[in-house]
């Protein structure tokens, strides 16, 4: 094992000099002997000097400290021993429960499955969340993006999805917290514990306060753990919160390495970095990875290069809108902006497709009529339009749903709504079977029968 010495430290970037015939390869892990800090090789500068990114704080590092090359990339524990544990980017436990005991360790830099190994499927994954199951259904082995600005409920939606899928489908999940709040990571851990699903989730955190190296690589750490389960023949769920922070960490690293920035200050390698991660999140003939990624949208601008690059990789997009959150409708999913490739009569069936398009049609018409109502009032509308508006307002409220993970805030018990009940309920509203009920009866209920019960008490 060759050893070198530190020649320069600039923030998270550390230059290390090795003998010229023993220069480590790109992505190899190096270890600073005295403090056990891991460095990852990013560039070879010539004359035996490599430029590395520190996977931890570089405070107190000094020139000419000894560094050892490991001769291989960063490797992390994989297998059942990771379930129920909180780990950092290096796979080290941070939950004070002792070492993570697994038989194998895998390197975090792996190539994507070949074209021949990949498998496409059109099987639906039921989430129990009405608006998602009806309007932007998830495919097993697909990629889903939760788009939203600050504070519209991306993390809460993600927590609800993990809870529902772990309790209803009994599958394994891997959660990668990329540059999010430590408080959220803590809440998340306790939420999983209280729901008794912690033993089915592996948690990997690289939070906001950590150096950019950790935040850039933590998604790969989580993904490597998920790939192991997939290659065992399982159907895995991979949650990444937040993919924007992955891009942001890449921007910081890129600037520290001295690369020229591109549009809006992002790294010139934005598309390639995103592709490297996304192409590995895929289903093979042995097992599947279904991924749900929260995507922070800077200043609510969907054309920003980061969310725009992410869009290209997704099968379904769930757009969380501030305007809907302001109405008090949660989950604040925009029913007209959210899309899914699975919403096709050949995949979901004629009835589901027609009900979904019917719901969107009514909401679209209501959107068009809103200006007229604002200027002239409801009385100027035709009878047909009045009926459309009344139904649209009921549908809008009925798209809300009490969440299990939000019970502590709302005081209302959570609801899991099976897909067949969702379709039947919306079909009944569209067919006018509930035109006689007041619209507030439809707010924060599960099925339409609950709305009818609620109406009796209003």
From Swiss-Prot:
It catalyses: ATP + H2O + 4 H(+)(in) = ADP + phosphate + 5 H(+)(out). Pfam families: ATP-synt_ab, ATP-synt_ab_N, ATP-synt_VA_C. It is a peripheral membrane protein. Keywords: ATP synthesis, ATP-binding, Cell inner membrane, Cell membrane, CF(1), Hydrogen ion transport, Ion transport, Membrane, Nucleotide-binding, Translocase, Transport. ATP binds at residues 148-155. SMART domains: AAA. Its EC number is 7.1.2.2. The keyword Nucleotide-binding applies. It is found in: Cell inner membrane. Its main location: membrane. InterPro entries: AAA+_ATPase, ATP-synt_VA_C, ATP_synth_F1_bsu, ATPase_a/bsu_AS, ATPase_alpha/beta_chains, ATPase_F1/V1/A1_a/bsu_N, ATPase_F1/V1/A1_a/bsu_N_sf, ATPase_F1/V1/A1_a/bsu_nucl-bd. One of its GO terms (molecular function) is ATP binding. PROSITE patterns: ATPASE_ALPHA_BETA. One of its GO terms (cellular component) is proton-transporting ATP synthase complex. The keyword Nuclease does not apply. NCBIfam families: atpD. F-type ATPases have 2 components, CF(1) - the catalytic core - and CF(0) - the membrane proton channel. CF(1) has five subunits: alpha(3), beta(3), gamma(1), delta(1), epsilon(1). CF(0) has three main subunits: a(1), b(2) and c(9-12). The alpha and beta chains form an alternating ring which encloses part of the gamma chain. CF(1) is attached to CF(0) by a central stalk formed by the gamma and epsilon chains, while a peripheral stalk is formed by the delta and b chains. Produces ATP from ADP in the presence of a proton gradient across the membrane. The catalytic sites are hosted primarily by the beta subunits. Belongs to the ATPase alpha/beta chains family. This is ATP synthase subunit beta. It comes from Alkalilimnicola ehrlichii (strain ATCC BAA-1101 / DSM 17681 / MLHE-1). The gene is atpD.
């Amino acid at each position: 094992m060759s050893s070198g010495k530190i020649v320069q430290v600039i923030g998270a970037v550390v230059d290390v000099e090795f003998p010229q015939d023993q220069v480590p390869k790109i992505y190899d892990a190096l270890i600073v002997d005295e403090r056990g800090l891991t460095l990852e090789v990013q560039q070879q500068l010539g004359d035996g000097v490599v430029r590395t990114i520190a996977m931890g704080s570089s405070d107190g590092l000094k020139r000419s400290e000894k560094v050892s090359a490991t001769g291989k990339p960063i490797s992390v524990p994989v297998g059942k021993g990771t379930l129920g544990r909180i780990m950092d980017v290096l796979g080290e436990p941070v939950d004070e429960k002792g070492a993570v005991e697994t038989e194998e360790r895998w390197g975090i830099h792996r190539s994507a499955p070949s074209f021949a190994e990949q498998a496409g499927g059109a099987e639906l994954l039921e989430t129990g969340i009405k608006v998602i199951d009806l309007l932007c259904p998830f495919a097993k082995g697909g990629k889903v993006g939760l788009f939203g600005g600050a504070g519209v409920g991306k993390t809460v939606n993600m927590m609800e999805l993990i809870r529902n899928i772990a309790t209803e489908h009994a599958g394994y999940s891997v959660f990668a917290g990329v540059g999010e709040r430590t408080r959220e990571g803590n809440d998340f851990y306790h939420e999983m514990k209280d729901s008794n699903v912690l033993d089915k989730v592996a948690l990997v955190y690289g939070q906001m306060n950590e150096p950019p190296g950790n935040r850039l690589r933590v998604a790969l750490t989580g993904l490597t753990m998920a790939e192991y389960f997939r290659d065992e023949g399982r159907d895995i769920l991979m949650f990444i919160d937040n993919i924007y922070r992955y891009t942001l960490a890449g921007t910081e690293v890129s600037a520290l390495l001295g690369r020229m920035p591109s549009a809006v200050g992002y790294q010139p390698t934005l598309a390639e970095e995103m592709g490297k991660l996304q192409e590995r999140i895929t289903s093979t003939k042995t097992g599947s990875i279904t991924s749900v990624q929260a995507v922070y949208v800077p200043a609510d601008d969907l054309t920003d290069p980061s969310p725009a690059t992410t869009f290209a990789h997704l099968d379904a997009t769930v757009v969380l809108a501030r305007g809907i959150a302001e109405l008090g409708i949660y989950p604040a999913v925009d029913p007209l902006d959210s899309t899914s490739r699975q919403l096709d009569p050949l995949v979901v069936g004629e009835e589901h497709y027609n009900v979904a398009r019917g719901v969107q049609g009514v909401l679209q018409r209501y959107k068009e009529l809103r200006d007229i109502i604002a200027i002239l009032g409801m009385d100027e509308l035709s009878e047909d339009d009045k009926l459309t508006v009344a139904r649209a307002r009921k549908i809008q409220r009925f798209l809300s749903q009490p969440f299990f993970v939000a019970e502590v805030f709302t005081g209302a018990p959570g609801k899991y709504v099976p897909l067949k009940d969702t379709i039947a309920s919306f079909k009944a509203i569209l067919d006018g079977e509930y035109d006689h009920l007041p619209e507030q009866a439809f707010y924060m209920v599960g099925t339409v029968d609950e709305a009818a019960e609620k109406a009796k008490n209003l």
